[in-house]
């Protein structure tokens, strides 16, 4: 992947949507729920505070994160889907 996020932005690879229900029924693409968790693949340098200091990011590449249903902007790069979002759109680090 050739994307480098700026400021406090994070690039997340969303987890794949469920293909079938617990009962074994296959879910069509139109009925799949958008996953709200994924893996951080790249992190920007951090946000610049009002005092001019760079505020360090709390997430790092490789972290599994939980984010809002409508968080981020979807992008398609080199055949893969990613989300670009601000660090503040991330609710928690799973672990």
Curated annotation (Swiss-Prot):
Q: Which residues form the signal peptide?
A: none
Which UniProt key words apply to this protein? Chaperone, Cytoplasm
Whether Chaperone counts among this entry's keywords is yes
Identify a single GO molecular function assigned to this protein.
unfolded protein binding
Q: What is this protein called?
A: Co-chaperonin GroES
**Organism ancestry:** Bacteria, Pseudomonadati, Chlorobiota, Chlorobiia, Chlorobiales
What is the role of this chain? Answer: Together with the chaperonin GroEL, plays an essential role in assisting protein folding. The GroEL-GroES system forms a nano-cage that allows encapsulation of the non-native substrate proteins and provides a physical environment optimized to promote and accelerate protein folding. GroES binds to the apical surface of the GroEL ring, thereby capping the opening of the GroEL channel.
What biological processes does GO assign it?
Answer: chaperone cofactor-dependent protein refolding
Indicate the family of this protein: Belongs to the GroES chaperonin family.
Q: Which organism is the protein's source?
A: Chlorobaculum tepidum (strain ATCC 49652 / DSM 12025 / NBRC 103806 / TLS) (Chlorobium tepidum)
């Amino acid at each position: 992947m050739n994307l480098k996020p700026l400021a406090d932005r994070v690039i997340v690879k969303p987890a794949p949507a469920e293909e079938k229900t617990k009962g074994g029924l296959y879910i069509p693409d139109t009925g799949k729920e958008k996953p709200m968790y994924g893996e951080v693949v790249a992190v920007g340098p951090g946000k610049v505070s009002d005092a001019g200091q760079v505020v360090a990011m709390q997430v790092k590449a490789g972290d599994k994160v939980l984010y809002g249903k409508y968080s981020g902007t979807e992008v398609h790069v080199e055949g893969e889907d990613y989300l670009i979002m601000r660090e503040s759109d991330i609710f928690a680090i799973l672990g």
